[in-house]
């Protein structure tokens, strides 16, 4: 794939690395590529970040035909810039595209585009501990048409945002609300796809959870309303009686890149891993029996997020005395160690940006 590069003549000022936050600061450049039916993907380019000029009838505004991804670039102490399993994000992009009638992007083109735009803006990658460059690839439908049908034109873009450490004061357990009123997704729907509608549907429950002092929502299945599925921005794991248990992918759960990494590492560390149905009632009983030993989420933003408290209806479960568990800490140290080049990547997961 040939990528035309046009660099900005007015580079922005680099931000204070002690106050980056998440998703509010953007680098100088972006990647763009267009799709036209009968031609395919074309005109790949890296240009200065700019506002988009779109007709108000563009289909993305009306029927939500869009998708997005999320990954990061990390600058190690050795000065090298690494991506973490970008091929997995590329493959997941195409799985989402299949469900939403969006054309595939070749995996190698996706990875090449990510590497190219990160290379152009590599001076924006922060160096402070725990910081990274968040990468947001996304595709929107651009046909100017009010009929309900797949668009014939699309725009693929990648923007970059330097991000602060998720745990500014160190790894800490969070409280999670198990939602039993609203539903995020159902089998046969779009739960496995990374598309905006899933996140918009989560907002009401998220606001309710925040109002009650919980940081995130843990969703139940949309049919029986009793089986654990995923957290709003993470997959979920439990250590029950020595075994690592996580909900099986069933079409309504996002197949997380970090989730897959956790499963592989747990097996390598010698922990038995079960991918299966888990009911909220099973968690309550395990906690009462002293067998719910640990709970943690996994995702790109936090990597590993220990859970110290779960609330389901009138039951509040305190897990591991609201402290970080052994498995959570080992996984966090291992994955972040690989990402930042602190430990050897014997899994072959990192891709260097040169």
Region locations from a protein language model:
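Short acidic-glycine loop/turn motifs at beta-strand connectors
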Residues: 34-41, 67, 74-79, 86, ...
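Conserved phosphate/anionic-ligand binding catalytic regions in large, soluble enzymes, centered on
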Residues: 55-71, 301-305
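Extended Lys/Arg-rich, glycine-bearing segments that form polyanion-binding/interaction patches
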Residues: 16-19, 86-90, 94-212, 327
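Conserved catalytic-core subdomain
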Residues: 1-18, 25, 227-354
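NTP/phosphate- and nucleic-acid-binding module
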Residues: 167-175, 183-195, 199-201, 208-219, ...
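Active-site-adjacent loop/helix segments that line or gate small-molecule/cofactor pockets in enzymes
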Residues: 24-32, 46, 59, 173-220, ...
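Intrinsically disordered, low-complexity, positively charged segments
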Residues: 1-55, 61
């Amino acid at each position: 794939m040939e990528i035309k590069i046009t660099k900005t003549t007015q580079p922005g000022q680099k931000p204070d690395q002690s106050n980056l936050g998440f998703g509010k600061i953007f680098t100088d450049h972006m990647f763009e590529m267009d799709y036209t039916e009968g031609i395919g993907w074309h005109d790949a380019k890296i240009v200065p970040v700019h506002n988009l000029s779109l007709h108000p009838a563009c289909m993305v505004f009306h029927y939500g035909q869009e998708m997005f991804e999320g990954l990061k670039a990390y600058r190690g102490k050795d000065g090298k810039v690494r991506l973490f399993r970008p091929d997995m994000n590329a493959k997941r992009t195409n799985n989402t595209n299949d469900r939403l009638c969006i054309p595939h992007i070749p995996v190698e083109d996706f990875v090449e585009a990510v590497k190219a735009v990160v290379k152009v803006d590599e001076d924006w990658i922060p160096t402070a501990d725990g910081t990274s460059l968040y990468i947001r690839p996304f595709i929107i439908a651009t046909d100017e048409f009010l009929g309900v049908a797949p668009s014939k034109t699309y725009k693929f873009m990648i923007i970059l945002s330097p991000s602060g450490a998720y745990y500014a004061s160190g790894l800490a357990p969070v409280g999670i609300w198990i939602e039993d009123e609203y539903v995020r997704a159902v089998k046969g729907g779009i739960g496995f796809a990374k598309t905006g509608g899933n996140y918009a549907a989560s907002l009401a429950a998220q606001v309710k959870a925040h109002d009650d002092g919980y940081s995130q929502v843990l969703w139940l299945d949309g049919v029986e309303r009793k089986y654990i599925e995923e957290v709003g921005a993470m997959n979920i794991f439990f250590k029950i009686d020595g075994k690592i248990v996580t909900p099986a992918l069933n079409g309504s759960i996002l197949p997380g890149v970090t989730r897959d990494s956790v499963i592989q590492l747990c097996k390598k560390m010698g922990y038995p891993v079960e991918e299966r149905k888990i009911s909220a009632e099973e968690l309550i009983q395990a906690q009462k029996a002293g067998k719910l030993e640990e709970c943690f989420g996994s995702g790109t933003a936090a990597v590993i997020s220990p859970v110290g408290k779960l609330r389901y209806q009138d039951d509040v479960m305190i897990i591991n005395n609201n402290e970080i568990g052994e498995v959570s800490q080992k996984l966090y140290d291992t994955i972040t160690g690989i990402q930042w080049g602190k430990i050897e990547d014997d899994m072959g997961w990192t891709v260097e940006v040169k």
